[in-house]
Design a protein with these regions (language model features):
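Short, structured surface patches at the beginning of a domain
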Residues: 1-158
């Protein structure tokens, strides 16, 4: 009869994320890579979370569910491929947050960048997000124009 500790019941979780649903193949590859890594280390994975959304978006449903489980002391380890797959900015803060709940994060591809390289990557990420937003606004503007034209045609009886 052994003592069942809380630590034994805590889960190892794989978290994989891509920005858009068009990247499903990339997500699948990311998950397989992480599963292979965990298997090679003898880690038994309890759940595999596949998420879609920008790394700048803090309102990702599955990501927030994961953080809630961290706060409930359900998660022992989170395994991610890269820091930016977890969160684009503020990774260090979230890592410390997880540590407060005795949750570790394993970054499989933990490349160390110089401060200059990191800054360049951050700027590129920001530019990418804003260019996507501008594209989305143009698309929305085009839709409004088309809707206005349809409304005019309906008013004219066409």
């Amino acid at each position: 009869k052994g003592i069942n500790t809380v630590e034994e019941n805590r889960e190892i979780v794989i978290y994989a994320r891509v920005s858009t649903r068009n990247q499903k193949d990339d997500l699948k590859n990311q998950v397989e890579f992480l599963k292979t890594f965990c298997n090679s280390k003898g880690m038994i994975v309890s759940q595999c979370i596949e998420d879609f959304g920008s790394g700048l978006n803090y309102n990702r449903k599955k990501w927030n569910q994961l953080l809630n489980e961290v706060m409930e002391n359900k998660i022992k380890t989170i395994v991610i491929s890269n820091k930016d797959r977890f969160i684009r900015f503020g990774y260090d803060w979230f890592e410390k947050f997880c540590e407060k709940f005795h949750t570790s994060i394993i970054v499989v591809n933990n490349e160390t960048l110089s401060p200059n390289e990191e800054l360049v990557q951050d700027i590129i990420s920001i530019l990418h997000v804003f260019s996507c937003r501008l594209y989305g606004l143009r698309k929305y503007k085009k839709q409004i124009k088309e809707d206005e034209e349809i409304a005019k045609e309906l008013q004219n009886g066409n």
